[in-house]
């Protein structure tokens, strides 16, 4: 399992944002799923992502990720407007598994409200990650 970036924040639903919780509101953040999620899902074969301009709400479903094992809802860890979608994942879904905290990012949001976010240590502890 990949190391959790310490400068990211995490949701209980296994999404990450590339910012700390205290610096989120008013900024644009990238969002993806964690290595814990990709390990549990297995090989990702499809992702339905929100569209640019969509409003997402923290804790609400905004897409889904399909793997060889199951289909899982994608939840937004923040509230705001989608400003970009990583079209590259549609060309190669394996990047979500291979680089979940880098090239496997899913979408970007201009944040108006943060949800309940955890530090890397809190997320690791809650999910039994060393």
UniProtKB/Swiss-Prot annotation:
Swiss-Prot/TrEMBL GO biological process terms:
glycine decarboxylation via glycine cleavage system
Instruction: Name the CDD domains for this protein.
Output: GCS_H
| N6-lipoyllysine found at | 69
Mind listing the UniProt keywords for this protein, alphabetically? Lipoyl
Cofactors named for this entry: (R)-lipoate
Pfam families (alphabetical): GCV_H
Q: Which GO terms describe its cellular component?
A: cytosol; glycine cleavage complex
Q: Which residues form the Lipoyl-binding domain?
A: 28-110
User: Cofactor note from UniProt?
Assistant: Binds 1 lipoyl cofactor covalently.
Residue ranges annotated as transmembrane are none
Please tell me whether the keyword Zinc-finger is annotated for this protein: no
Its function, per the record, reads:
The glycine cleavage system catalyzes the degradation of glycine. The H protein shuttles the methylamine group of glycine from the P protein to the T protein.
The UniProt family comment states:
Belongs to the GcvH family.
Q: How does it assemble?
A: The glycine cleavage system is composed of four proteins: P, T, L and H.
What is this protein identified as? Answer: Glycine cleavage system H protein
Q: Which species is listed as the source?
A: Corynebacterium aurimucosum (strain ATCC 700975 / DSM 44827 / CIP 107346 / CN-1) (Corynebacterium nigricans)
Gene symbol? gcvH
